[in-house]
Amino acid sequence: MKYKSYSLWGIFIFLYSSIIIPQWVSDPATNLAICTVEQTQRETRLCKDDAGNIFIFWRDYRNEPTIFGGDLYAQKLDMCGVPLWQSNGNSIISGFGGQFDLKVINDGEQGAYLVWRTSPNSFQDYSLNAQRINNNGNKLWGSSNVTIQSGLGTTLNQSITMNEDGDLLTIWQLGLTGTPNSMDIYTQKINSNGVVQWNSNGLAICLTSAISILGPKIISDQNGGAYVCWSDNRNGLSNFDIYAQRISSNGTPLWSVNGIPICTKTGTQGTKHIFSDNNGGAILFWEDIQETTYSIYGQKID
């Protein structure tokens, strides 16, 4: 079978101080083993809590060793590198089909928010899901998780953040089933109890004929809503421009349909970042590519 080409990996971690002295293992040639079970471990993600501990998450194929399989496992280390959970990690998310492409952030209460994709029906039908765990790795939003979007097509490139109220904010791309040459953007807010706050199956942000969308990003507007930004090529296959939208606390887009243009220069504007200005606005930075010249630009929005 083709799956036999999969190598057997393990997960190791090391931490060095500023003068390159090993902190967790006395032998500088040896790293700290996190998971060494048979089958593959990959797609590692890290998240710290407010007490100096570290959550380590990964996709683990021990129970479903095929290219379409893999569950989410995790380990927690204290600041001295001592594992706090069971050997080779706790099972966090499991089920039929692969659980993958995890995004994780600190929840501000020594736990974590998780958003990931799964493929329950086919290789091309990826749903988007969320969960919150506490400091012991226990699920806080029920065993069935929270479905963010499902049944519409392929979700991808999700980005997450947390607002000042402890709500989870996420944004993602969607390739609709039956329209493979068009990408849309959706977003969602989930409160700390796991209750979806905006439209069921996601709030539509950009519904255009754009073939490609690059890396949507989201940040809190510090008023219960959010700023979002992305690049798309609605104006030409090789002409990616920057657009943005602001969403109110109740899930209403406040600016023009499909976003306002931030930069529409000829060429490609991509690899963007968005930050709060800590005064209700947002600051954007992006790469501007003109043939062989790369430049960095920025803009403030409110």
Q: Where in this protein do the model-derived segments appear?
A:
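Bacterial N-terminal signal peptides that target proteins for export
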Residues: M1-W9
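Cleavable N-terminal signal peptides
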Residues: W9, I20-I21
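Extracellular, repeat-based ectodomains that mediate carbohydrate processing or recognition
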Residues: P22-D302
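N-terminal leader/targeting segments
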Residues: W9-F12, G111
